[in-house]
Amino acid sequence: MFKDKTLLITGGTGSFGNAVMERFLESDIKEIRIFSRDEKKQDDMRKLYNNDKLKFYLGDVRDLASVKNAMHGVDYVFHAAALKQVPSCEFFPLEAVKTNILGTDNVLTAAIDYGVKKVICLST
């Protein structure tokens, strides 16, 4: 099913993103794109896994242009980017809305625009 396919994982440096990446890394998938706004975690992953299937995209789901940049040529998406700590979301509700709601809308918009086959959206 994933042979010669490209997978995009938003929030790819987070706990779920790492788990999805590890699951697919040993498969016959062509490319796994890790999309996140954490440059340090991306660099750590790049060094740890040292695998040509992994491609890293620095960006933010709140920015449609950066999402579209990573989405071009993608077959499947696991959307795991989110602010998930309840105290943080309560203290910064606007940031939570921007990331969790508008960010999800950006991911879905880009996926539709680029003809992605399937998007899996996670929620906590």
Walk through the language-model features, giving the residues of each.
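Conserved glycine-rich Rossmann-like NAD(P)H-binding loop of the short-chain dehydrogenase/reductase
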Residues: 28-41
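Short, conserved SAM-binding/catalytic segment
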Residues: 44-54
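Conserved Rossmann-fold cofactor-binding substructure of NAD(P)-dependent oxidoreductases
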Residues: 55-76
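N-terminal Rossmann NAD(P)H-binding glycine-rich loop of SDR-like oxidoreductase domains
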Residues: 5-27
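Adenine-nucleotide cofactor-binding loop residues
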Residues: 40, 62, 84
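Conserved residues in the N-terminal Rossmann fold of short-chain dehydrogenase/reductase
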Residues: 36, 58, 98
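Conserved Rossmann-fold NAD(P)-dependent oxidoreductase catalytic core, especially the SDR/UDP-sugar
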Residues: 76-79, 83-124
